[in-house]
Structures are given as structure tokens and as C-alpha cells.
Design a protein with these regions (language model features):
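A structural signal for conserved, well-ordered secondary-structure elements
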Residues: 1-337
């Protein structure tokens, strides 16, 4: 623990430093590759797997899998439904430790639903009443999507304005929003790559991570503003070096914040997915789990380097860096004598 504290202190004082800003092309390349993967792979796999809330359809919940293992229970349910309704496109999942079987199909008529309910009850050797049926229309999911997009647009606009006013430069705002979109694309893309079902709860999780990512970015940017604002005419650091120092100074804090945030989210994900079988808990926590990891990466390796790059072309920054390098060269000449 003491060594980790010393590590953080060394980063803060500059005794130890990682050249994060100077290697920004590497981080950009990694992000570009990830974004390419999460866009291309879902396309090759036929797109995202949207939940029944978005597409509409019928759902059947079997109270018990009759002592079968997960694979056997899924195969039995799939074959049973296809035997009754060959074109129903059944999607079978096992819910929780109680091994409840959930079957989702395309929209069915009342008679078709009753026939499948009876067939499932017979296949699993339970009463008809132990197989619950429900119909879900696509309207609710469409409303959630529309509201989510509206909320996303409003969030991006308001966050851009607030950050531009707070930091007094639109370039910090642009860097932060770019990092947010980076997080959203990769987090949502992971669902497409691994063919994880996208539900309204997952969409809510996608939007929630934007708040965390923005908070982490603001902490780093505040330190960047402090460092670059303190640098006067006699500064011994270039602008990029001041930004890099700020990132190193907040590195331990970013990691600690992420660990503290991800532990309870991971616990909820474990409990929701494996113990309770609660779909909503699982969907939200999975999106948050992925988003926190990606958000921490983007704050350190995307937002700060991008801001330094955006400012590097300014005349004032160029003059300052030129003056700093000239002072260093003069010092080396004097030292050589």
C-alpha cells in the first residue's frame, strides 16, 4: 500500500512520468482499431440482436427446466416451439439458478400462443399454469429508443456548452465530447460483437456511462487547466509536457475511481446474471461495467492527448514551446562549457 502511495506521489511530483501525450498516435490507433472491429463485426454477423421490447413478439416463461442442464433445456424448448410453429423464430435463454426457461418468439396469435404453452408444459412435464405467456408490442421499445436519442442529443449539446463556458475554450469541450462518443460506440459495439441482446435497460446503461466518463474527464481537464494556467513566460515545460504532467498527476485518482466504481457494478452483474436471473439488473450493470473500463481509457488516452493536439497549432502555444526549447538548448550549452 505504501509503495502504491509512493508511486502516486512520484507521478504527481514528476519524479516518475509516462509519456502519454507523446505517444498519442498509438492510443488513437488502438481506438480506431476497436471502433473498426465493433462496427464491422456486427455488420458481418447480421446486425445487433435487439430484445423483444424493440421488435415485439410473444414470450413464454417455463417455471422449471425439469432437472435438465442449460444446453438440454434450451434445445428442448427450441425443438418444442419449432414443432408447433416452424416459423416462429424462437430465442431461448436460461434465467437464474432456478433454471427457468424463457422463450421469445415472433408475434403469435392467441391460438398459437396457447398451443405453444401446452406443448412446453408437456415437454417439461409441468402444468400448463406453470408456463406463463405474455405479448409485448414494439411500441414501448420504440418510445424508449426515441427518448434515449433525444436525451443523448440534449446531453451532448448541454455538456458541450457547459464545458466550453467552464474551461473557457471550445477545444476542451470538443475533446471531451469526442471521448464520450468513443465510449458510447465501443460499449454499444461490444454488444454487437458478442451478439448480446440489446434491451431498453442496456440503452439506459449506455446513457448512464456518459455521466461517469464526463466526470472523469473533467477531473483531468481541471488539472490540465491548472498546470497550463500556472506556466508563465519562464516555464520549463512545453504545453504538451504540462498536459502530460496533469494526466500523470491524476492517473492514480482515475484508476482508483474506476476500481471503486466497477466493484459494486461487477457485484450487481454477478448477482443479477448468475444468482437472481434478473434481466434488467444484468443488462444495466453489463453496460456500466464495459462503459467504466472504456471511459477510464478514453479520459487518459484520448481526451487529454486530443486536447493537447488541438492546442498545439495555436500561435501562443508555438511561441511558448519555441521559447522553452531555446532556454533548454542554452542551458545545455552553458553546462557543456
Amino acid at each position: 500500500m505504501a509503495s502504491f502511495a509512493q508511486f502516486g506521489n512520484d507521478l504527481y511530483t514528476g519524479k516518475r512520468s509516462y509519456n502519454i501525450i507523446g505517444k498519442r498516435k498509438i492510443w488513437y490507433g488502438i481506438s480506431a482499431l476497436l471502433i473498426l472491429i465493433v462496427i464491422v463485426v456486427p455488420i458481418l454477423r447480421g446486425g445487433f440482436l435487439f430484445g423483444i421490447e424493440f421488435l415485439g413478439g410473444s414470450q413464454f416463461q417455463v417455471a422449471s427446466s425439469a432437472g435438465l442442464n442449460s444446453t438440454e433445456a434450451q434445445v428442448l424448448a427450441q425443438n418444442t416451439v419449432l414443432k408447433v410453429e416452424p416459423g416462429s423464430n424462437p430465442r431461448v435463454t436460461i434465467v437464474g439458478q432456478n433454471s427457468e426457461v424463457r422463450v421469445q418468439t415472433d408475434q403469435l396469435t392467441s391460438d398459437q400462443s396457447v398451443a405453444i404453452q401446452q406443448a412446453l408444459a408437456q415437454a417439461y412435464k409441468i402444468k400448463d399454469s406453470e408456463v406463463t405467456t405474455s405479448f409485448i408490442g414494439p411500441v414501448w421499445g420504440q418510445d424508449i429508443t426515441r427518448q434515449a436519442l433525444t436525451g443523448l442529443i440534449a446531453f451532448v449539446i448541454l455538456a458541450s456548452i457547459v464545458m466550453a463556458l467552464y474551461f473557457r475554450t471550445w477545444k476542451m469541450s470538443l475533446a471531451a465530447i469526442t471521448a464520450l462518443l468513443h465510449d458510447l460506440i465501443i460499449t454499444a459495439g461490444v454488444y454487437g460483437v458478442f451478439h448480446i441482446e440489446v434491451t431498453p435497460a442496456a440503452v439506459i446503461g449506455f446513457l448512464t456511462i456518459l455521466g461517469y466518463s464526463l466526470y472523469d474527464t473533467v477531473v483531468v481537464f481541471d488539472k490540465i487547466r491548472e498546470n497550463t494556467g500556472e506556466d508563465g513566460a519562464e516555464s520549463r515545460r512545453t504545453f504538451a509536457e504540462s498536459v502530460n504532467l496533469a494526466v500523470n498527476q491524476t492517473l492514480v485518482r482515475s484508476i482508483n475511481t474506476s476500481v471503486v466504481a466497477i466493484l459494486p457494478v461487477g457485484s450487481i452483474l454477478f448477482i443479477g446474471a448468475l444468482i437472481l436471473g434478473a434481466g434488467t439488473l444484468r443488462d444495466i450493470s453489463l453496460a456500466l461495467f464495459i462503459g467504466i473500463i472504456v471511459g477510464t481509457y478514453s479520459t487518459i488516452f484520448i481526451a487529454a492527448p486530443l486536447y493537447a493536439q488541438l492546442r498545439s497549432g495555436e500561435d501562443a502555444v508555438k511561441k511558448r514551446d519555441k521559447r522553452t526549447r531555446a532556454v533548454r538548448e542554452a542551458s545545455l550549452v552553458v553546462a557543456a562549457k
